[in-house]
Amino acid sequence: MEITKDIRYIGVDDHDIDLFEGQYDVSENGMAYNSYVILGDKIAVADSVDAGFVDEWLGNLEAVLDGRTPDYLVVHHMEPDHSAGIAAFMERYPQAQIVASIGAFRMMVNYFGTDFSERKMVVKDGEVLDLGGHSLTFVGAPNVHWPEVLFSYESTDKVLFSADGFGKFGANDIEDPEGWACEARRYYFGIVGKFGKFVQAVLKKAADLDIQIICPLHGPVLTENLGYYLDTYNTWSSYQPEDEGITIAYASVYGHLKAAVEELASALEARGQKVSVFDLARDDMAEAVEDAFRYDRLVLASITYQGEIFPFMSTFIHTLAEHAYQNRTVALVEAGSWAPAAAKVMTKELEGMKDITLAQNKVTVLGSLNDASRAQIETLADELSK
């Protein structure tokens, strides 16, 4: 695929994968591992692909070289889905140099038993690789989302190579009917979300660049309305709500708490609120995390289980915490047969999160719904709808 006259796409699509990073469901739409070629007087290849696709990737590369030989392999990110082809590339093109951060070369020793010391070029923030007619200026992007990461900026065609930044789930040969944001959001908050301050730092650097195209390592090449993508990443990485709305995440066993959640959702919708509801035992928890970050209000609803909260709820709250969940209003719904304690436990688990405002009202379901708990639902719906 031609991105510009001298920049080509040589990535691959993976439709065999079911779980990305061993946990994120991509079984329906697969995954893309992106790689690019910059054809200047010298040729640079940007990143490789996952281990199962190295031969296909090298074939894609040969198809665009037109008999020429690459001079450089630029490694922006060492995660194996982007670095598995390094050794094969260096063997096939023995005159080529490898360009990466010092941290990436340290990782190469761990993965390949060598840092290619006779052929390596260490670069850091602000340094330039001149290809003749094109050049790459490197932008340090540590912890977006690994410590060795670099972005690079090609100044002639105004292209930002953004490593895992601006990536999304899904193969590139399938059109996503939901557009970019949904699976990009699930990807961001699942994989990059913990590192918001580092994303903010690299966005500040990028603000000084005239960016016309963004080439990420996953998902589509972004060529239009780039302000939208940059603004969205700024919102996500500053932990601000993207939209007004309420996510309800619940863990129910015998259906009594589920019934309370359904009544609460209906009461909120009747008050004009946008509501998304997740059964943490059955729905994709990564999507629940995604919507918890997307909206400005969250309801946690759990049964009391062995004096604590149900394990799926505990996992959900822990996942939010480790991804730096903050700046939201949280309401609690609890249930139990004799001594409901879930609200107390959830309150304690929320204590370490930054700028969390607990709703003044809660709902307690003792056994099953009754007039008292239904009245609490209405009161909570009023509070969350103000």
Language model segments and positions:
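Conserved beta-strand hairpin/beta-sheet module of binuclear metal-dependent hydrolase folds
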Residues: 2-62, 151-154, 158-162, 257
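Metallo-beta-lactamase
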Residues: 2-5, 100-149, 195-201
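Metal-dependent phosphodiesterase/nuclease catalytic metal-binding core
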Residues: 37, 151-215, 223-250
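Active-site metal-binding motif and surrounding structural segment of the metallo-beta-lactamase
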Residues: 41, 52-99
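Structural motif
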Residues: 42-44, 72, 134, 158-161, ...
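Active-site neighborhood of phospho(di)ester-bond hydrolases with catalytic His/Asp-centered motifs
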Residues: 46-48, 70-78, 98-101, 160-164, ...
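FMN-binding flavodoxin-like domain, especially the glycine-rich phosphate-binding loop
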Residues: 172-214, 218-221, 263-278, 288-386
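Short, charged N-terminal beta->alpha structural module
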Residues: 249-271
